[in-house]
Amino acid sequence: IFPRLLERKEQQARTLSGGERRMLALGRGLMTRADLLLIDEPSLGLAPVLVDEVYDRIAAIASSGVTVLLVEENFAHVREVADRVVLIENGAVVLEGTVDDVLNNAAVTATYLGVGVDE
């Protein structure tokens, strides 16, 4: 599921790096044939070089028709795979819409994304 892991298919999981073990765990979940996939912060603890690989796979799964519910704090990653975004603060929905809806909302981008904030 991840080319980087295929290169290490003969290794035992305990010999993989922490990020590779996280990718292995994520890969096991991604291999299910579910209609809905819930993924909680898949890039957490991954080296930057591994993050792109993970999000490429998530995007491929989403484009295959699987509904992906993704919890992620890094909006740059969300932009890559999301059709819709829900911002939640303290359990309450702050904004729901397309990625463009969120990015075009000046108050939301200033508060949550740190964009357009006057210093």
Q: Residue spans of the language-model regions?
A:
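Hydrophobic anchor residue at the start of the ABC signature
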Residues: 26
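ABC ATPase "signature
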Residues: 96-97
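ABC ATPase C-loop
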Residues: 29-30
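Conserved ABC ATPase signature
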Residues: 12-16
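A short, surface-exposed alpha-helical micro-motif characterized by mixed small hydrophobic
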Residues: 78-80
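Helical segment within the ABC ATPase nucleotide-binding domain
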Residues: 52-64
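Catalytic Walker B motif of ABC-type/P-loop ATPase nucleotide-binding domains
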Residues: 37-41
